[in-house]
A protein has these predicted regions:
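Glycine-rich phosphate/pyrophosphate-binding beta-alpha loops
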Residues: 132, 157-162, 204-205, 343-350
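A short, Trp-centered hydrophobic/proline-enriched beta-strand micro-motif
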Residues: 119-127
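Amphipathic, small/basic residue-rich leader segments at the start of a protein or domain
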Residues: 1-89, 111-118, 246, 269-278, ...
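Internal helix-loop-helix
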Residues: 50-119, 161-167, 243, 282, ...
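Glycine-rich phosphate/cofactor-binding loops in nucleotide/flavin-utilizing enzymes
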Residues: 3, 7, 15, 70, ...
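A structural signal for short hydrophobic beta-strand segments in well-ordered beta-sheet cores
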Residues: 141-144
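A short core secondary-structure module
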Residues: 148-149, 153-199
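Glycine-rich beta->alpha junctions and the first turn(s) of the following alpha-helix
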Residues: 3-9, 14, 196-287, 344
């Protein structure tokens, strides 16, 4: 298996162009911590669309660019490293669009994909619940068929961007008999339907991109079912692969690291050792992400990528807190980055769960007793 990641000239040109666009975006719309979840700007999404950077890896048949995954990784790396506001189109581009062109009906593809590609439509993902986080199969939100509709009742939490989203991709339970994971289905839920209440959740760093969603007798057209009824668990695992194998978690703290470097005492041996470890970590993390984008390692390899990159982010935050000292409490972005670090290894799949995936599916170790 090749580990030759020599950058092609066209990739370097893309990187330079993405960096220039990101810098202009930051100058106009501000620099954002975790810009892929906090930096909402539809105007900047339209800039990305004009560049062909939304849906750039989607098949040409569905309006996408048909470009290799490594090119999207390079573009995203520059955007997030700069703190450019890409959140408005991020979930649609990364997960919802691929889910719809893979599993959706022709009508769903025709109606929904163009809005994603233009940067007009905003999406969120209704997955986690108060009693169902890492164990997706235990979720309780129900969708009961009633003629040409599903009647949805339940609650979602930790839903990024729900307050501004026009659509929510909701995982719900359509069947109670049989194995729990086989009773799950995915519905496209317009957020303006009656019976939906969205409440922003103020997190420990003072931001409110997370929301909880309450669904009370929400009537969703049955035509909004994505894929097969009862097939959501498998479909969701594919979606999580897109999330876990991305560059976002590796470089979200890059602005914080750059700031810490400006204030670091390079005469201190401990500081030099930490910098060497972090720089090595960045390079290893990038190799893991690039390897996945080039189709090496298999689908389950993304679990290891996510586990490594989030733990690396935590090391960056710890380094910055030590180097900056009291200055780390000044402003908004720096305290947010440091205080939010403990959550990195929880959201999107805990490190413990990801290690189980690697052990059981990649190393073929015995399954964890349940």
């Amino acid at each position: 298996m090749s580990l030759d990641f020599a950058m092609r000239p066209e990739w370097e040109q893309l990187r330079a162009r993405a960096r220039a666009v990101a810098e202009r975006g930051v100058a106009e719309y501000g620099r954002w911590h975790d810009s892929w979840i906090n930096g909402h700007s539809k105007d900047f999404s339209k800039v990305l669309a004009a560049e062909g950077w939304i849906g750039m890896t989607w098949p040409v048949a569905y309006g996408g660019g048909g470009r290799p995954g490594i090119e999207r990784i390079i573009m995203a790396e520059e955007m997030i490293s700069a703190g450019a506001p890409i959140a408005a189109s991020w979930f649609a581009d990364r997960q919802m669009g691929p889910s719809i062109y893979l599993y959706g009906t022709d009508s769903q593809k025709t109606e929904l994909l163009p809005g994603m590609l233009s940067g007009e439509a905003t999406w969120c993902i209704g997955m986690s619940e108060p009693d169902a986080g890492s164990d997706l199969a235990s979720l309780k939100t129900t969708a009961v068929r009633d003629g040409d509709h599903y009647v949805v009742n339940g609650q979602k939490i930790w839903t990024s961007g729900a307050a501004s989203a026009e659509f929510c991709y909701v995982i719900c339970r359509t069947r109670t008999e049989g194995p729990p994971h086989r009773g799950l289905s995915e519905l496209i839920v317009p957020m303006d339907l009656d019976g939906i209440e969205v409440r922003p959740v103020r997190d420990m760093v003072g931001t409110s991109h997370f929301c909880e969603i309450f669904l009370t007798d929400v009537r969703v057209p049955a035509s909004n079912l994505v894929g097969t009824e009862g097939g959501a668990f498998k479909q969701t695992m594919v979606q999580l692969g897109y999330e876990r194998g991305g560059i976002d978690r590796l470089v979200s703290n890059r602005p914080l690291y750059d700031l810490a470097l400006e204030h670091a005492d390079l005469s201190d041996p401990r500081t030099r050792q930490e910098i060497a470890a972090i720089e090595t970590g960045y390079r290893l993390g990038r190799l893991m992400v690039y390897r996945g984008a080039l189709g090496q390692g298999g689908a389950d390899f993304s679990a290891g990528t996510k586990a490594y990159c989030t733990e690396h982010e935590q090391r960056v935050a710890q380094f910055a807190a030590r180097v900056l000292g009291p200055a780390a409490t000044v402003g908004e972005a720096v305290p947010n980055s440091i205080c939010y670090a403990p959550a990195y290894t929880i959201q999107g799949g805990t490190s413990a769960i990801l290690r189980n995936i690697l052990g059981e599916r990649v190393l073929q170790l015995p399954r964890e007793p349940r």
